[in-house]
Amino acid sequence: MKTNYEIRYAAHPEDAKHYDTARIRRDFLIEKVFSDNEVNIVYSMYDRMVVGGARPVGEVLKLEAIEPLKAPYFLTRREMGIYNVGGPGVVKAGDAVFELDYKEALYLGSGDRVVTFESKDASNPAKFYFNSLTAHRNYPDRKVTKADAVVAEMGSLEGSNHRNINKMLVNQVLPTCQLQMGMTELAPGSVWNTMPAHVHSRRMEAYFYFEIPEEHAICHFMGEVDETRHVWMKGDQAVLSPEWSIHSAAATHNYTFIWGMGGENLDYGDQDFSLITDLK
């Protein structure tokens, strides 16, 4: 196995509005979340969020404590949320064993233990997408499925944004230090998410898009309300959203995305909305 990591530094909105396409993609887009028998990690300076992915194909992959953590174990001072977006898989955390099927999630609290990822079938490998944030205390590990989620049905087919927001790793379901994660599923014929747009300066966010055919693409919108930019994305890619940025998208096909947040509070509803007609 191999662990790859990179550090992404934070940007001031006054600087970011001058970025060209290549710079925007380099600083905010995470193109390769999954590689066979590798753990790919992006360590972001936005609230020190870690975004990563692991795809074990006939090997057991270990979550290593990358050098920037300066810790004996990855979870020594961190909590983590994991989603399986591939074939059936297994996550082991110390002596605990968790089987995760497609779209099932797992919360791991902080503590000194080895974490590993493996697939049940190498011909149908699991794909583990994860977010991690710093933690001031330990909370119990817990597997969470859509049956456990707080579900909000939003939008309409007429508005091209009919979707279910599955709030899964949130404080209405289980205790966390600052991590919140969920999964939004767009209905066939719907392509817009998070519109009207909003920001939450108390929290940064990361989006991971999947369940979109290879010949289609997602146009993710970011930036300040009066200085928006776009990032064209494919399935199985992620994007960082600074606390000052909107985060929305439209696509050429319906899709699903996993959102993860961290920062000042655990209030999902703490959002500052903008009128659609104010976007520039």
Region annotations inferred by a language model:
Residues 100-120, 232-253, 260-262:
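Conserved metal-binding segment of the jelly-roll/cupin
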Residues 122-163, 258-280:
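Double-stranded beta-helix
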Residues 94, 139-144, 179-180, 191-197, ...:
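A short secondary-structure junction signal
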Residues 75-90, 185-188, 200-226, 232:
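Short, conserved beta-strand element in jelly-roll/cupin
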Residues 86-134:
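Acidic, low-complexity central loop/insert segments
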Residues 1-66, 70-71, 75, 79-80, ...:
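Hydrophobic, proline/glycine-rich low-complexity stretches
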Residues 33-68, 162-205:
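A short glycine-rich, His/Asp/Glu-containing loop-to-beta-strand
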